[in-house]
Amino acid sequence: MGYLELKNVNLDQHLLSRVEELYYNSFPPEERRPWNSVKSLLKREDIRYKIEVIQQNGKFVGFISSWDFGSFCYVEHFAVESSVRGNGIGAAAISQFVAKSQKGVVFEVELPHCGEMAQRRIGFYSRNGFDVHADFEYVQPSYGEGLSSVPMLLMSANMSDDLKISVVAKTILRFVYGVKKD
């Protein structure tokens, strides 16, 4: 597989255009925010949003965008170039990310009945140490006007026993999507 590295990216780096291309190729419109919003988040210093590129032997092969909420990290987007999928890069990147974060890590995933890709994605995260919170009802809010909300599942790894998934979901909804929910 070769040397794999996660590296923070900022607005000045040429790698951001590679991230943007993979972002649009990997996620449907209802599962992504407008790119200008991504760039605005990267400019802000008062929030804990970041994008890390995944590099294999110095070559861009993917990215992880995440939010650090202190007691857990929420991975908003994770994608690996289609040309290198199936070679263990995604598993190695997730393993590195979880180890580096030293806290719980949470993902949203599509419901299994959404198709084979959704089932494969859930299987991938399960094989990599993530638990499905199947009995917790969760809906990803709309990213913007004209876009649908999406029923999802939350998956987590390394979560503290005293951190409830309902609190995690409220935090994500409030700070990532701007939804205030009691």
What positions do the PLM features span?
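Conserved beta-strand in the GNAT
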Residues: V53, K59-D68, F72-A79
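Conserved GNAT acetyl-CoA-binding A-motif
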Residues: S101-M117
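Active-site rim helix/loop that mediates acceptor-substrate recognition in acyltransferases
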Residues: F27-I51, Q55-Q56
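Conserved acetyl-CoA-binding loop-helix of GNAT-fold acetyltransferases
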Residues: V80, G86-A99
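Short amphipathic alpha-helix that is part of the acyltransferase structural core
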Residues: M1-S37, P151-M152, V167-D182
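Conserved catalytic-core motifs of GNAT/GCN5-like acyltransferases
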Residues: I122, S126-G146
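C-terminal "cap" of GNAT-fold acetyltransferases
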Residues: M117-A118, Y138-D182
